[in-house]
C-alpha cells in the first residue's frame, strides 16, 4: 500500500535509497522524505540547505544544518587586479550558461560542465593557479556540495555561487513583479507541492514559464 501525505524516515541500512529506482518511485508521491546517510545521494535532487547533521548534547540528539552559512574560502586581495582570465563553470548548458557567457568580458572564460555530477571532474582538469567561479542550482546541488567544498579549501582559488536556480535569479531580480511572486519568494514552502515538483528548481522554472507565457518580449523557455 502506497503512503500519502506522510513524513518518511529511512536510514542508509536500506541501500535502495541510493538507486535510481527509488528516486523514480518517490517522485510520484506527495510525501516528505528524511534520508539518514553519510553518503551522498546522487540520484536525488536535494538542496544544499536541507542537509543536516545530528548534534548530540548530553542525552539529547537534534538535527543541525551543515551548510547553513558559507564563509569566504579565498582572500579578497587574491581576486583583485587579476591578470589571467577568470573561468566560470556553469552546471547547465542552456539558459544559465548562455546568460553567463553573454556577461563574460575579455578577462573571463565560460564553460559548461553539462551537469552537476561533472563539475568536480572539470575543476580537477584546470591549472592550479586558475581563478574559477562555479555557478550551480543550490536547490539540487546537495549531493555534490561536500566534495566541492573540500576541493575549494585545498585549492584556495575557487568561488561558489549557488542560488536556488537560474530561474529563481530572474524571479528575484525585479524584472517581473507581483504580490504573489513576492510571497512565493518569501515563503516557497507554502506554494511548492512535493507531488507536482520533485525539486524547488522545477517549480521556479515552471512558474517563470507560466508567468511570461503571454509576453512576447520576456517569454522564458529553459
Predicted regions, residues:
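Conserved helicase ATPase motor motifs in RecA-like P-loop NTPase domains
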Residues: 32-45
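Small-side-chain structural scaffolding
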Residues: 37, 48-49, 134
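Conserved catalytic segment of ABC-fold P-loop ATPases
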Residues: 45-53
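Acidic, divalent-metal-binding catalytic cores of TOPRIM
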Residues: 5-10, 14-23, 27, 41, ...
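Short glycine-rich substrate-engagement loop in P-loop NTPases that contacts/grips substrate
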Residues: 1-3
